[in-house]
Amino acid sequence: MSRIGRAPVEVPGGVSVEISARSVKVRGPKGELTVPVGRGVSVREEDGKLLVERSSDAPQHRAMHGLTRSLLHNAVVGVTDGFAKTLQISGVGYRAQLQGQNVVLQVGYSHPVTVQPREGIQLEVPNPTTIVVRGIDKQQVGQMAAEIRRVRPPEPYKGKGIRYEGEQVRRKVGKAG
């Protein structure tokens, strides 16, 4: 048995779960998410918990077992608390500002770069060197943060660029001479 797949998913109060043949719909105070259920895996609700079971020990079914449980857990956390990812901007003159829902980045190019949020994602700029990406879908939040980071990834010599909060940038020594 998968250690991850075996663990039940707690369903807190205020969250409703609707189970159908190939998907599970999770509704909560922050919104609604639909989680697909793969082949060979079934989901049932028991005593305020979601239990994920698999039909056989085939490698594909074992893989889907843990994956489905993790996706369900992320959906429950997303509709109750939501997810956030913080990006730090470092570099002389590098900054971000909010224009409506879009973020305008000035990160060393000859022109400002405008980033539009995906549907269901909110972008915040608490100060000019910090961007916070918020949403209920963990995958979408991570994808949006990766797209913003890709505008100017941190470079290894001076560390200038956009990085995730807590990310360690491997530094290189410059040319001698």
Swiss-Prot record:
The keyword Transport does not apply. GO terms for molecular function: rRNA binding; structural constituent of ribosome. GO terms for biological process: cytoplasmic translation. GO terms for cellular component: cytosolic large ribosomal subunit. Keywords: Ribonucleoprotein, Ribosomal protein, RNA-binding, rRNA-binding. SUPFAM superfamilies: Ribosomal protein L6. Belongs to the universal ribosomal protein uL6 family. This protein binds to the 23S rRNA, and is important in its secondary structure. It is located near the subunit interface in the base of the L7/L12 stalk, and near the tRNA binding site of the peptidyltransferase center. Part of the 50S ribosomal subunit. HAMAP family: Ribosomal_uL6_B. This is Large ribosomal subunit protein uL6.
